Amino acid sequence: MTDETRAKVETVIKDLGYRVNVAARNLNRDHTGFITLAVPSLIPPYLAELANRTIEAARQRDYSVYVTTYAEGSAKGARDLLKNFNSTVSDGMILSMSEVEDISPEDLKVDFPLVIVGARTTWGVADHVTPDDVAAAATAAGYLYDRGSSRLAVVGARDDYDAAALLQAVEGNAQLRLRGVIEEMRRRGLELDPHLIGNTDQDWTIGAGARVTQRLIDSGVPFDGVIALNDQLAIGALTALRTAGYEVPAQVQVIGFDNNEEAPYLQIPLTTMDSRLDWTAPTAVNRILGRIDGSITKPELLTTESQVIARASTR
């Protein structure tokens, strides 16, 4: 095509307001150019950041992302999403599976590319991309002990404390993180005091962290370190401790998980375990695209270590 002809075509396109029909173009290529990211909700900061990082990682590979939630409003859950996946609008799914979803191995035996992210097991049926929560929690506990804490409280348990069951846990953020704390304490010849475990059920919000920490304070059982199982809980714990007159970190150290955006900007900047979303999102995208193009055929578990992001809530 000559430059003159190209200029004429571009003028006509502009005058007519023509836009490329991406869906139609991709049908001709035997793929849609889209992947689906399914999360329980976009309210938790961790999941919102997962979505943003997944979109960016996909964009770098010339893919777009449909983001959908399956645990809000009239949504019917992850199982329904898996059952009714539409391959004409998306080439595959990255699924962040909630701890409360009733999912079986059979549910994950699907006929489209699927990658699971997060702390739920896939029973070896599907690709699984997740940081090592057990190792991260052990690191967090060790970090507090090495800086002078001797009695640790944990904020964010889901169920009644059962050390034997927790040591066998293979899924669930709360269970795996508690397992890591217990393992690290036992390596040091210590036991976690059941009276210092704050149960928040499924509520991992700032308010829950504050309420449960206040209950621990009111119990009168002494503690000088708090492991909050996410940063929202940790922010609540910091609020309760300061309201009760405790000096952080001089009297009580606090560490969270996920390195949320607000963590560095609190009145007492929060020490936290890195969420490793910088690794999780691009790894999941690379994995799903490998499934789509056929270069990856066997399910794998892909994990990585987390590091302490040290700030003023610890010594």
Listing of model-derived features with the role each one plays in the protein:
Residues V22, D30-G142, D146:
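Alpha-helical recognition/docking segments in bacterial nutrient-uptake
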Residues S96, V117-A119, P131, V155, ...:
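Generic beta-sheet signal
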